[in-house]
Structure formats: C-alpha cells, structure tokens
Amino acid sequence: FYNVGKMPDQDIAELARSKNIDIAIDLTGYTRNSRPGIFACRAAPVQVSYLGYPGSMGANFVDYIIADHTLIPEQSQKFYSEKIVYMPHCYQVSDNSRPFPEADLSRAELGLPEAGFVFCCFNHNYKITPREFDIWMRLLSRVEGSVLWLRRSNEWAEVNLKKEAETRGLDPGRLVFAEKCDYSEYLMRISKADLFLDTFHYNAGAIANDALWCGLPV
C-alpha cells in the first residue's frame, strides 16, 4: 500500500509504472476529488473506467469502461470513446458480507415523524429536476402524513426545494434533509425509509444498490 494522496499526478503514474502495474482502474471519473490526471499520464498499459462515473471520459487515455446493457444500451454506444466491456447481468459487484449496522436511531432522532410513510431520495440534489419533483409533490399530497427524506447537499438547494414545495401547495416541513454521516449510519438510515424514489435523467447507482441491500424498494 502506498499513500499517494499528496503526490503530483505525474509522480503517481511513474510510481505505478515502476511497480509494473498492468491494469489501472479509475473509480471516480470526473466526480468530486477525482484524479484523472494520473490516468492522463498513463499509470498502466491498460486503463479502465468503472463504477463511480458511468459516462464516457471522452479521453484517449481510458481504454475500457465496464458496464451492463442497462447502463449502456446498444443505442448509446456511439457516445462512448472507450471500448465497452459488458458484464452478463449487473455491472455493480454486490455481496452480503457487509455487516448491518448495530446502532439504531429512532425516527425522531433522525428528524422524521413517528408515524407516516417515508419517501426518500439520497441522490445528490443536483439530480432532481422539476419533472420528478412534481411527481414527488403529488405523492405527498395524496399520502396523508407522508414526508420526503432528502440528502442535504447544500443550503441553497434546501431553501429552493422547500420553496418549490410551498409553491405547489405543500408544507415545506414535509421535506426532511439528512446530514452527512458515516457509512454505517447511512445504511441504518436507509432501512428507516419506506420507498426510495429515483431520479430520471441521472439515476442512482451505488445508492440504489445499498437501498436494495437494506431491503428498501426502489
């Protein structure tokens, strides 16, 4: 194991080549805190994009992307510069070895009402468009006492989403925002919801996987 967090991209790539790494896998693509510069410097003869960024890198230094036919249907292949390696079923690797969190918080401790149906979407707020938000608000209006549990991405998104709920005739207090937490508590939180609502244009990936693993319908 080498801690290379503070090293420049070029130095990391040179270190990888000196260790005769055959395949380098990029798990983050163009997402936050990613380091595509390492791959631009050719850390390995074969470089693969996987899991964290399902779009094309659009770069000649990424040779392959691992996917399935749901993630990249045949009609979307033309939008990818990488060669696509298709898994036979699902491209995400799932297992049952993760321990379910022992800590258990009450609904009140999580900011939820003691009774009532809990819809949730823990995707980043920027994935929410007016189309699905309209649907979600109609759900809240038809399911008495229900709430929508969202991820707190930033204060501006929270203010704007509450404002949009109010313009649709709903009490903005029915939108509950969850603070960032560690992975164990995050899994425990998911298990407290009743239904995960996905976003249309930019779907949930690992989060949907986690929800299903916790027994939460998506």
Predicted segments, located by residue:
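A generic secondary-structure signal marking the coil-to-beta-strand transition
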Residues: V46, D63, K83, A115-V118
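Conserved nucleotide-cofactor-binding alpha/beta core module
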Residues: F1-F61, H69-Q77, W149-V218
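Conserved catalytic-core segment of nucleotide-activated headgroup transferases in glycan assembly
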Residues: H89-D182, R189
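Donor nucleotide-sugar binding/catalytic pocket of nucleotide-sugar-dependent glycosyltransferases
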Residues: D63-Q75, Y80-D95
